[in-house]
Amino acid sequence: MPKISLIGKDLAKEGIEFVFAGPLPTCSDCRVKNVCFNLEQGHKYRVTKVREQLNPCIIFNGDKVNTVEVEELEDFFIIQESKKLQEGAIVTMKSMNCDYITCPNIEKCNLYYQKNDLKVAIKSIGQNVNCPKGFKMKKVQVTYK
């Protein structure tokens, strides 16, 4: 069953993918905030249907948000290689806290937009990832727990 959420009317297109960054303090008094915030922070979603319903919003440009149906997607992270890294394992993700800001993988190693101690199931282990700091890193496909 799809989840219902709200997204800026300029972004409300079927097939668009996004990561829910979490609630904003500005939204605490909004009458429809529960619809916006019924998604999990840091999880990846795809819009599957755009409904015609528009709601006011002080955050998005145009001051309007569309009601949309979304599905949660699998995601990937880049994690340090270890003997415990196995398909099917449930692991607690920890940020690398890397300071190499020009690295193209920094968001997936540092777990931006994620809650601390995120639990995931490793669906598949992908290729090696070149780390400019010399760590042995792997790309892994995950599902959220």
Curated annotation (Swiss-Prot):
It comes from the Archaea. Belongs to the UPF0179 family. PANTHER family: UPF0179 PROTEIN MJ1627. This is UPF0179 protein TV1250. The lineage of its organism: Archaea, Methanobacteriati, Thermoplasmatota, Thermoplasmata, Thermoplasmatales.
